[in-house]
Each structure stands twice: as C-alpha cells, then as structure tokens.
C-alpha cells in the first residue's frame, strides 16, 4: 500500500468522524439541547421505556407539564435521568418540577443535589422526550459497561477502514 492510499484511508476515517460530529452539533442547535439523543440506562421508566431505548429530545424553552417525560441532569453529575414530571409550580419567573420514575416507589427528591427540592426547568432539564426507538441503544450500554467490547469495536472500525481499498 502506497502513501497515497494510506492518506486516502485516513481522510475517509476523518470524514466519518467529522460528519458524525457536525450532525450531532446540528441536532443540538435545532433542538436547543446539548444532548438531543440519549439512551435509557436503567429500568426506572418501565413499562414506558426499556433499558437500551434511544430517546429523541426537544428543548425549545417549552414549559414541562405534569405527565411529560423529561430528561434532566443533576448538578455535578453528567448522567442524564429520564423520568416523568410529577408536580410543577412557578416561583417568580422559574418553573420548578418534581419528577419520578414510573417504576420507582418514591419521587426523585433523594436524587437531586443537596438542598435542592425541585428541578429548575431552565437550568436542569436537558429536554422533553418527543420520540423513541426501542432497544437500538443497547450497543451504547455494552460499550459503556464492557471495556473489552469497547476496544474490540474500536479496533474493528480501524481495521476495516485500513483494509478498505477505496
């Protein structure tokens, strides 16, 4: 394999990663959410959503209503949580929310940051769930939970790119 073929393969791989990044950022701008697509990581929302379901979010500064399924992040942690709005009220110009997983016995007050009694719709919500694809995100869970699977997939992607003759 000559240098021109190697450079072409490298550029093809860079093109794939760049395209994925541009699509991700474009979705973020369109949906006004830093994470427009999330994967359900636990069974707390069963039977509505199963572990491994992919959720598509929308966050165009809409107020959440009781019964809406929202994704939020707790201050200081980067793990998105998918739960249903149990209660909402307004405090001056802020919408405050209390959430609960459908499969959980109690509300999420114990999950929130210390001294936090409600979620702030503007600062804590990642988005509201608008659509989902069942089980397609299970690969993400495998990659996250299994180091060997993660490196195996990465290795296969690199090898397949290097062995391609185009």
Curated annotation (Swiss-Prot):
Which stretches of this protein does UniProt put in the Cytoplasmic compartment? 1-9
Can you tell which superkingdom this protein's organism belongs to?
Answer: Eukaryota
Write down the Gene3D superfamilies for this protein, in alphabetical order: Umud Fragment, subunit A (2.10.109.10)
The record's subcellular locations are:
Endoplasmic reticulum membrane
Reaction equations catalysed = Cleavage of hydrophobic, N-terminal signal or leader sequences from secreted and periplasmic proteins
Specify the protein's topology with respect to the membrane: Single-pass type II membrane protein
> Is Transmembrane helix among the key words of this record?
yes
Q: Which UniProt keywords apply?
A: Endoplasmic reticulum, Hydrolase, Membrane, Protease, Signal-anchor, Transmembrane, Transmembrane helix
Q: Where is this region: C-terminal short (CTS) helix?
A: 152-163
GO terms, biological process: protein targeting to ER; signal peptide processing
Signal peptide residue numbers: none
Known Pfam families for this protein?
A: Peptidase_S24 (PF00717)
Membrane spanning segments where?
Answer: 10-30
Cite the InterPro entries for this sequence.
Answer: LexA/Signal_pep-like_sf (IPR036286), Pept_S26A_signal_pept_1_Ser-AS (IPR019756), Peptidase_S24_S26A/B/C (IPR015927), Peptidase_S26 (IPR019533), Peptidase_S26B (IPR001733)
Q: What is its EC class?
A: hydrolase
Give the CC-aspect GO terms: signal peptidase complex
Query: Which positions are catalytic residues?
Result: 44, 83, 108
| EC number from the UniProt entry | 3.4.21.89
Q: Which residues lie on this side of the membrane: Lumenal?
A: 31-166
The molecular function terms of the Gene Ontology recorded here are:
serine-type endopeptidase activity
- Summarize the subunit comment: Component of the signal peptidase complex (SPC) composed of a catalytic subunit SEC11 and three accessory subunits SPC1, SPC2 and SPC3. The complex induces a local thinning of the ER membrane which is used to measure the length of the signal peptide (SP) h-region of protein substrates. This ensures the selectivity of the complex towards h-regions shorter than 18-20 amino acids. SPC associates with the translocon complex.
Q: What is known of its domains?
A: The C-terminal short (CTS) helix is essential for catalytic activity. It may be accommodated as a transmembrane helix in the thinned membrane environment of the complex, similarly to the signal peptide in the complex substrates.
Which family is it part of?
Belongs to the peptidase S26B family.
- Role of this protein: Catalytic component of the signal peptidase complex (SPC) which catalyzes the cleavage of N-terminal signal sequences from nascent proteins as they are translocated into the lumen of the endoplasmic reticulum. Specifically cleaves N-terminal signal peptides that contain a hydrophobic alpha-helix (h-region) shorter than 18-20 amino acids.
Name of the protein described by the UniProt record: Signal peptidase complex catalytic subunit SEC11
Name of the gene: SEC11
């Amino acid at each position: 394999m000559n240098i021109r073929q190697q450079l072409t393969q490298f550029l093809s791989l860079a093109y794939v990663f760049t395209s994925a990044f541009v699509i991700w950022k474009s979705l973020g701008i369109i949906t006004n959410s830093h994470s427009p697509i999330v994967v359900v990581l636990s069974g707390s929302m069963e039977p509505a959503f199963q572990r491994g379901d992919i959720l598509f979010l929308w966050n165009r500064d809409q107020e959440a209503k009781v019964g809406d399924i929202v994704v939020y992040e707790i201050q200081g942690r980067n793990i998105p949580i998918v739960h249903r709005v149990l209660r909402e009220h307004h405090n001056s110009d802020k919408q405050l929310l209390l959430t609960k997983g459908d499969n959980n016995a109690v509300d999420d007050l114990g999950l929130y940051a210390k001294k936090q009694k409600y979620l702030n719709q503007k600062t804590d919500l990642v988005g509201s769930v608008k659509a989902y694809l069942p089980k397609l995100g299970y690969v993400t869970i495998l990659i996250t939970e299994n180091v060997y699977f993660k490196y195996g997939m990465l290795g296969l992607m690199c090898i397949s790119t290097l062995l391609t003759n185009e």
